Amino acid sequence: SAASGPAVYQRKEHYRIYRTMITHDTKIRVWYKHTDQMGFVHHSNYICYYEEARSDLMRSMGLSYADMERKGIIMPILEVQSVYKRPAFFDDCLTVRILLREMPTARIRFEYEVYNSQGELLNTGMTQLGFIHSDTRRPCRVPDWFLKLVADKWTEE
């Protein structure tokens, strides 16, 4: 059963889906260059918004992608999904909510919800990244220090 407080870090449990998760909101202002001829945010920009939210989440946990690279770990994208529900427009203030629902293994899966300032859901998405040794370019398990960071930030759903 899930603990009522923060998740306790235990490698043997990291395959389990917890009732708890990590969520983080990132605000993004739509620039004119992000829009297409129809005046909508071009679909490709949502992938960039996901990346910005991931980087912001990592920094909020006390770790940057540059820190990970210095520790010899890189995280390439393995899979991306994006579902467009409503358009966003120039100068909209978007909230990109990132959710981490599962403890990572050799891969980590992030989910995204993009809202406009009226709270309307515009887009949902998912990215799956792998953990790779930067020197050998070979897959590896999630490092213990990364699992501990995630476990320390785990919150009730």
Name each region found by the language model.
Residues 22-26, 59, 89-90, 101-157:
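HotDog/MaoC-like acyl-thioester-processing domains
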Residues 39, 98, 137:
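Hydrophobic pocket/interface hotspot
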Residues 20-60, 117:
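Catalytic strand-loop segment that frames the active site of acyl-thioester-processing enzymes
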Residues 1-20:
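N-terminal amphipathic/basic-hydrophobic helices that include classical n-h-c signal peptides
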Residues 10-12, 32, 152:
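Generic cytosolic/nucleocytoplasmic N-terminal low-complexity/intrinsically disordered segments
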Residues 28-32, 84, 131:
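Hydrophobic residues in beta-strands and at strand termini
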